[in-house]
Regions:
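Conserved FAD-binding subdomain of flavin-dependent enzymes
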Residues: 1-13, 136-144
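Glycine- and aromatic-enriched mobile tails/lids
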Residues: 6, 10-43, 80-81, 173, ...
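Conserved redox-cofactor binding core of oxidoreductases
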Residues: 8-97, 102-104, 109, 150-155, ...
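General beta-strand structural signal in soluble alpha/beta enzymes
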Residues: 14-17, 68-71, 100-102, 108-109, ...
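Alpha-helix capping and helix-loop boundary segments enriched in small/acidic/polar residues
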Residues: 48, 94, 98, 117-125, ...
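FAD-site-proximal beta/loop scaffold in flavoenzymes
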Residues: 76-100, 247-299
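Glycine-rich loop(s) and the adjacent beta-strand/alpha-helix scaffold that form part
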Residues: 105-159, 206, 308-325
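An anion/pyrophosphate-binding glycine-rich loop and adjacent beta-alpha core
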Residues: 133, 139-255, 325-331
Length: 505
C-alpha cells in the first residue's frame, strides 16, 4: 500500500470513489482466504493505469533532472577479472558510434521479451535486450519456461484489452453464446487467473466452439455494461476496439485470443535488486555492480504464475529497494573500478561481423522464424514432443545468427543494424525458454504440458504438479546451452510460509 500512496502523492490520477478514497476493481485471481471469494483490490486509473504511472514517474525524473541517453542502445555488459560489472557498451543511434559507459553500478530495467513470440501484447522494443546482455556475460537466466498468456489480446492484432474489462463485468462467450467460464471456474468465472482462463479459451476453440468463420477466437462481451460505464471506466478499450477490430464495443462483442503477455522468469536477483549467480557452491552469490528490476528480473515474487497488477507493484517496490541499495553501494565505493583491456571486444566482434557481411540471412527473416517457432512450440498448451522439436529448431536458428547480413552499412539512424543486434538477444531468450520448458516434465503455474496433466485430486501429482522432483528454479546458461537448478526459498522474511496447494476457482 505504501507505494500506491507514494504514487498518489506524486500526482498519479487514480480513479476515486464518491467518498474520495482510491477506486479499486476486481481483477483475475484476486481473492480472499486463498480462493474463497473474489475481492476488489486493484487500484486503477480508468483503463490506463500503466500509462498514467509511466507519465507520473517520468515527471518525477524531470523534477530530479535525470539524464536520459535517448536513442541509444545498450549492447553488452563489461565484467572485470573478478566478475564484477564495471560498465556497458552502447551504440549511439544518431551517429552509429560505439561508446563505453564506465559505471560503479549498472541497473537493467529493459522490460520483458514478449517479442520472441509471433503474437504478443508487448511493444516492439521488448526484444529481451537486458536478458541477452546478461546471458552473453555468463549470467544464468532463471525460470524462463514460465510465460503468461493474457486471455484478451485482440484477435489478429495482439493488442491488449485490459483485464479491467472483466473486472468491470465483461464476459467471455463461445460460438453457442455460452458464458463458458462458469463451467470451468464456478466461483471466479471470468476472473479466474490468466493462465487458467487462457487454457479454457484454448480448450473451447480446440473443441470446435470458437467463433468466426474459422472458429479460431472467443468473443468478449461488454455492451451490457452500458456506454456510460465503458466511456468512463474503459475509454482506451473503446478506442482499441474501433481502431484494431473495427468494433464498437458499446454495441457488439470483440474477438479475442490468448496472447503472450509477461515472463515470470528473468535475470535472478535478491530483494535488493542485486543480480545473483551460482559461484563456489553458493546459489545466490552477488554479482557486484549489477542490478535488475521489473520484468527482466526474477526475484522471484511471482513464482510460476503472476497475478494481474502485481507486475507494477513488483517494479515499484524493487525499483525503490534497488535505488536505495545502489546509493549505499556507491557511497561505500568512491572510485570506479578500472575497465579491463578487453572491455569492448565482444561488442566489436558483433559489429564487425555485420560490417563485413556480404550475403546471408536478413535479420527480419530470422526474427520472424524465431517468433513462428516459439508460437508453435511454446504456446498455451504444450506437449513434450512439440517442445523437443522446438529445441531442435531453435538450435538450428541459432546457427544462422552468425550469418546475419546487413545490406545497408550506413551509420546514421540505421534501424536495420538495430534489428540485427536485437536478433542476438531474441535468440538467447528463445533458446533459454525452449530448453527450460522441454526439461521441466510436469505442469506448474503457467507451464502446462498435456503429457503430464492429472486431475486435482491425484494423490501424487495434483493437476500434474510434481513437487518432489520439480519444485526448484531452472537456471539456463548460454555458454554450452546447459541447465542447472537451485532450490526454492520456502521461508519468506516477513510473512508465514505458504506451501503449494491445488488451486480452486
Amino acid at each position: 500500500p505504501k507505494v500506491v500512496y507514494e504514487l498518489e502523492h506524486f500526482g498519479m490520477p487514480f480513479d476515486r470513489n464518491p467518498d474520495g478514497t482510491i477506486y479499486q476493481r476486481p481483477f483475475g485471481g484476486h481473492t480472499a482466504n486463498y480462493g474463497e471469494k473474489p475481492v476488489q483490490r486493484a487500484c486503477a486509473a480508468a483503463d490506463r493505469t500503466g500509462h498514467a504511472m509511466l507519465h507520473t514517474l517520468y515527471q518525477q525524473n524531470v523534477k530530479a533532472k535525470t539524464n536520459f541517453f535517448v536513442e541509444w542502445m545498450a549492447l553488452d555488459l563489461i565484467r572485470d577479472e573478478s566478475g564484477d560489472v564495471v560498465g556497458v557498451t552502447a551504440l549511439e543511434m544518431e551517429t552509429g558510434d560505439l561508446h563505453i559507459l564506465q559505471a560503479k553500478t549498472v541497473l537493467l530495467a529493459t522490460g520483458g521479451a514478449g517479442r520472441i513470440f509471433a503474437a504478443s501484447t508487448n511493444a516492439f522494443i521488448n526484444t529481451g535486450d537486458g536478458l541477452g546482455m546478461a546471458a552473453r556475460a555468463g549470467i544464468a537466466l532463471q525460470d524462463m519456461e514460465f510465460w503468461q498468456f493474457h486471455p484478451t489480446g485482440v484477435a489478429g492484432a495482439g493488442v491488449l484489452l485490459t483485464e479491467g474489462c472483466r473486472g468491470e463485468g465483461a464476459i467471455l462467450l463461445n460460438s453457442n453464446g455460452e458464458r463458458f467460464m462458469e463451467r470451468y471456474a464456478p466461483t471466479l468465472k471470468d476472473l479466474a487467473p490468466r493462465d487458467f482462463v487462457s487454457r479454457c479459451m484454448d480448450q473451447e476453440i480446440k473443441e470446435g466452439r470458437g467463433c468466426g468463420p474459422n472458429k479460431d477466437y472467443i468473443l468478449l462481451k461488454l455492451d451490457h455494461l452500458g456506454a456510460e460505464t465503458i466511456h468512463k471506466r474503459l475509454p482506451s478499450v473503446y478506442e482499441i476496439g474501433v481502431n484494431f477490430a473495427n468494433v464498437d464495443i458499446t454495441k457488439e462483442p470483440i474477438p479475442v485470443v490468448p496472447t503472450i503477455h509477461y515472463q515470470m522468469g528473468g535475470v535472478p536477483t535478491n530483494i535488493h535488486g542485486q543480480v545473483v549467480e551460482q559461484k563456489n557452491g553458493v546459489n545466490n552469490s552477488v554479482v557486484n555492480g549489477l542490478y535488475a528490476v521489473g520484468e527482466c528480473a526474477c526475484v522471484s515474487v511471482h513464482g510460476a504464475n503472476r497475478l494481474g497488477t502485481n507486475s507494477l507493484l513488483d517494479l515499484l517496490v524493487f525499483g525503490k529497494a534497488a535505488g536505495r541499495h545502489i546509493v549505499e553501494f556507491n557511497n561505500k565505493n568512491k572510485e570506479h573500478k578500472p575497465l579491463p583491456a578487453d572491455a569492448a571486444d565482444r561488442t566489436l566482434e558483433r559489429l564487425n561481423q555485420l560490417e563485413s557481411s556480404k550475403s546471408g540471412t536478413y535479420a527480419q527473416t530470422l526474427a520472424g522464424d524465431i517468433r513462428a517457432t516459439m508460437q508453435q512450440h511454446a504456446g498455451v498448451f504444450r506437449t513434450q514432443a512439440s517442445m523437443d522439436e522446438g529445441v531442435k529448431k531453435i538450435a538450428e536458428l541459432r546457427d544462422r545468427v552468425a550469418s546475419v547480413t546487413l545490406q545497408d552499412k550506413s551509420k546514421v539512424f540505421n534501424t536495420a543494424r538495430i534489428e540485427a543486434l536485437e536478433v542476438d538477444n531474441l535468440i538467447e531468450v528463445a533458446q533459454a525458454t525452449m530448453v527450460s520448458a522441454a526439461a521441466r516434465k510436469e505442469c506448474r503455474g503457467a507451464h502446462t504440458v498435456y503429457d503430464y496433466e492429472h486431475p486435482a485430486d491425484h494423490p501424487e501429482f495434483p493437476l500434474g504438479r510434481n513437487d518432489q522432483e520439480w519444485m526448484k528454479h531452472t537456471l539456463w546458461y548460454s555458454e554450452g546451452n546447459r541447465l542447472d537448478y537451485k532450490p526454492v526459498n520456502l521461508k519468506p522474511l516477513t510473512v508465514e510460509s505458504i506451501p503449494p496447494k491445488v488451486r480452486t476457482f
